[in-house]
């Protein structure tokens, strides 16, 4: 069995007694903690930072390496607790502070997640709307082109129909003009022939000239009625005019 009691060096039960230092213990103020966190972040995080380097970066008078070491261990433990591991036994104020920090971190994470989701949703919806509008514009452009082509086709057909109708109308007007001109010329020739016969010749010759003129005119009328064009009308009229002139000159010589 082991020995119990006081040893020669004053150690009770083999455990070294706690000796309180006459110097007051250093208190970690918020400013000192912010300086500590800044030093840890500069060193690349809580697992890459060492107490010696943190102490050197902080450069605070009265701060020892043991203070930094204990605070770094507590800081690592608090970070582990925030990640979901069992919470170490500490004071109520520390637990309340860590709970507040946890709630703030959780709220920040949720806001970050929602912001990222909103950004992603906005990005995808923007791309989708942009692609949809581009497709609709392409469809609208295609439909507009088709409508323009159809309008041009209808307009071309309308112009051709209008041109054809206008051309046929001009041809009909020309034909009517030729008919009216031929009828007027025929009427004038009849009047001139009747007047010349009545003034220059006796009554019997006048009757004969009238009969010859009427027969020639009847033949001319038959020729004109059998023809079907303004140019044929003019040719028939010209030939009948020549016959009438020949008959008239022959009769005058005999008289």
Curated annotation (Swiss-Prot):
GO biological process: regulation of DNA-templated transcription
Disulfide-linked positions: none
Signal peptide: none
Main localization category: nucleus
DNA-binding region, residues: 51-76
Residue span(s) of domain HTH myb-type: 20-80
Presence of keyword Chaperone: no
GO molecular function annotation: DNA binding; DNA-binding transcription factor activity
Domain of life (superkingdom): Eukaryota
Compartment(s): Nucleus
Keywords: Activator, DNA-binding, Nucleus, Transcription, Transcription regulation
InterPro entries: Homeodomain-like_sf, Myb_dom, Myb_dom_plants, PHR1-like, SANT/Myb
CC terms in the record's Gene Ontology section: nucleus
Disordered: region residues: 80-110
Function (record text): Putative transcription factor.
Protein name: Putative Myb family transcription factor At1g14600
Species: Arabidopsis thaliana (Mouse-ear cress)
